[in-house]
């Protein structure tokens, strides 16, 4: 190791990702990524997860097999931090030989809205519903479904409680881009148009889901994936999504 590399290694704030607490973000993110991999949400290194804890943001790296991720692979940003340009983001801990997640500006967008955790998956069911909505309702329509019990697992909006059985769940859909970072403006626009939404679908790509904390983001992501799978099966049977 050359002197410059020794300096980086010595001053890399590794203590930020070292904890015996299973609820520590550096331990939670690899554990969540393993679960998501087993559920088929983050195959082929796709997807990502980020958690905000106080003035620190913990982010899964780019290009690491999600089922093999370890705490020492996690990036840490000082919060708040500039979203753009990428070179101005205040990383206070960088794993050697790994690249920051391409999802970073999208995660930061969720944190700007007060989220405590943001999850990005490549769920097949999420992709399929974006295609069905485009074919049936056009490219500008959002995903809508009502009268499904699992809708109760999705917030009505910040401080507004949860949706009810008779409510209509609406999830905006944005178009995919060639590069992940370029989705940011679309995500921001969708958040502005649907301020009560806790998720945004990306056509032919996947979904971003955020929550007030890690548990809420995870359970909301689970509920949505269940709903999307149900919606695909309902469509096969000719059943309407909204009564």
Curated annotation (Swiss-Prot):
Enzyme Commission designation: 4.2.1.109
Active-site residues annotated for this sequence: 149
Gene Ontology biological-process annotations: L-methionine salvage from methylthioadenosine
InterPro entries: Aldolase_II/adducin_N (IPR001303), Aldolase_II/adducin_N_sf (IPR036409), MethylthioRu-1-P_deHdtase_MtnB (IPR017714), Salvage_MtnB_euk (IPR027514)
Binding annotation for Zn(2+): 120, 122, 205
Pathway linked to the protein: Amino-acid biosynthesis; L-methionine biosynthesis via salvage pathway; L-methionine from S-methyl-5-thio-alpha-D-ribose 1-phosphate: step 2/6
Class of this enzyme: lyase
Pfam name, any one: Aldolase_II
Chain segments carrying region Disordered: 1-22
Gene Ontology CC annotations of this record: cytoplasm
Cofactor: Zn(2+)
Localization per record: Cytoplasm
Any one GO molecular-function label of the UniProt entry: methylthioribulose 1-phosphate dehydratase activity
Catalytic activity, reaction form: 5-(methylsulfanyl)-D-ribulose 1-phosphate = 5-methylsulfanyl-2,3-dioxopentyl phosphate + H2O
Keywords: Amino-acid biosynthesis, Cytoplasm, Lyase, Metal-binding, Methionine biosynthesis, Zinc
Biased composition annotated in UniProt, kind: Polar residues: 7-16
Cofactor comment text: Binds 1 zinc ion per subunit.
Residues that hold substrate according to the record: 103
Role played: Catalyzes the dehydration of methylthioribulose-1-phosphate (MTRu-1-P) into 2,3-diketo-5-methylthiopentyl-1-phosphate (DK-MTP-1-P).
UniProt record similarity statement: Belongs to the aldolase class II family. MtnB subfamily.
Protein name: Methylthioribulose-1-phosphate dehydratase
Originating organism: Penicillium rubens (strain ATCC 28089 / DSM 1075 / NRRL 1951 / Wisconsin 54-1255)
Gene that this polypeptide is encoded by: mde1
């Amino acid at each position: 190791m050359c002197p410059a590399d020794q300096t980086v290694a010595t001053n890399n704030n590794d203590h930020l990702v070292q904890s015996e607490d299973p609820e520590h973000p550096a331990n939670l993110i690899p554990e969540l990524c393993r679960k998501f991999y087993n559920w088929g949400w983050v195959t082929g290194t796709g997807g990502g997860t980020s958690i905000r804890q106080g003035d620190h943001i913990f982010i899964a790296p780019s290009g690491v097999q999600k089922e093999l991720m370890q705490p020492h692979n996690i990036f840490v940003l000082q919060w708040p931090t500039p979203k753009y340009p990428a070179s101005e983001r205040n990383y206070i801990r960088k794993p050697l030989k790994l690249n920051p997640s391409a999802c970073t500006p999208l995660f930061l967008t969720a944190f700007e809205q007060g989220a405590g955790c943001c999850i990005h998956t490549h769920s097949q069911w999420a992709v399929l519903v974006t295609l069905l909505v485009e074919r049936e309702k056009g490219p500008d329509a959002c995903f809508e479904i009502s009268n499904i019990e699992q809708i109760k697992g999705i917030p009505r909006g910040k401080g507004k409680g949860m949706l009810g059985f008779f409510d209509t769940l609406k999830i905006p859909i944005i178009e995919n881009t060639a590069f992940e970072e370029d989705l940011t403006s679309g995500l921001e626009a969708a958040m502005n148009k649907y301020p009560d939404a806790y998720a945004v679908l990306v056509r032919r790509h996947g979904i971003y889901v955020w929550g007030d904390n890690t548990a809420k983001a995870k359970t909301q992501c689970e509920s949505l994936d269940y709903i999307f799978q149900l919606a695909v099966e309902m469509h096969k049977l000719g059943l309407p999504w909204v009564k």
